[in-house]
Amino acid sequence: AALYHAAALRSCYGRAAAHEVELSDYADPSQTFGAMPIVVECGDELQLPPVPASAGLFADRRQAATEHLAGVEIFKQKDYVYRLSTMKRFTDATQITILTKMRRSGGCKLTKQEWKAVRDTDISAASATEQRRRLAGTELWYQAAPTWATVSMAQVIRPRLSAVKAAATLFIVPAKDYILNRPQNPRLTDAYLTEVISSIPNMNNTGRLPSIGLVHLGMIIRLTNTVEAPEAVTDSTGEVVGIDLDPDEPSAATEHTSAIEGIRILHMQPIITVKLHGVRTEFLPPVSCTLHAATSACRDCTSCDFRAGCIAVEAQLSRRSFPVEVQDPGSDTWYTIQVQRRQLPMTIKAASTINTLQGVTTDPGLIFHWKFPRFFSSELRWLATYVALSRPPSLAQLISVGVPDELRSIIEAGPPEGILSRFDDMFKEKEEATHIRAAEVMRELGWDATD
């Protein structure tokens, strides 16, 4: 909510000089976002809250800061609120019915066939032969989970499968971790400390930098930190189109760093060129064709490459250190060391946390691990379930691992009351008025409301 307030205010700063906007009126209904004549916002209230949840627009406001409260009030100033009811992503009638029942206030029972369709996505109890059959052809599928322990595993599995599919060399890039307060203990060897530090799965605890980077030409990646605002920002996606090794990197011909063919472990951190999705900005110098090599790249030449949307991604140093608990292997003594990490700020797009999965259509498919963290409330379990079941276009494109016994009751219970009531408190009256007004406009235009 505080971020929403900041966005509304900064939009006024940007438009004040050109449009004579009065900054002090930025929170008035007609003046928000710099008096933009039309502001359209799209979203789904049935999504996981931000981290921390207290920052969300639907969070408890009793002890919220002034900026938070201002953001909520600006958010509530919508003229029209319309809830879309037709899901265009899906091709599976059973899946649509299940999701419709999930959204029904008060809950709704699944039929035996509907529950069987969910259970049949689970491969946990299948034989090894059947699991291999079901997993065949899923090299480019998404793999996601609510826990970082599983996601960190997927961040290794998906690049290897993607590299095999692309017939490309997979480069392994270990992070450079710097210990700022190393204890004077000979048993805490470099190898031991490296293993302990690299075993931390949650990238939120490591400056959003992975302990091991894996990359190959053609891999679809997600940036884990901002590289170049406002376009190459956190969670931007793109394709790896270039891998420039450090000049001091040992030659692959003289140093065999991996016994597995097609994998190369790097000693130095490379520079990765990524072509960002949906971006046309020219961040890098153009590459001239042979004809224009002596002069400069020509805009009219189809062979000259201006590398639109391409950006060079270098290793970043985490902005602050992070704590790591280390046990003395020879005693019960524990140390808290502070570590700062340098690493490429990227990971494969297909390995995803449940939060990052929101808003994504997981095409060609999704492998989902149904293990909820113990701290997940009933509300978070329902939201995570809804997100997982609503990402793939069909249940045939969902492979489940470890469907819990409680999943059916989660689905049938319907959305937790708090989610619905918080949204209705803000927008129920406006939503009803919007439907009435929409019907009137359609009649005025002569449109058929049944289309």
Per-region residue spans from a language model:
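Conserved ATP-binding/catalytic motifs of P-loop helicase motor domains
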Residues: 1-451
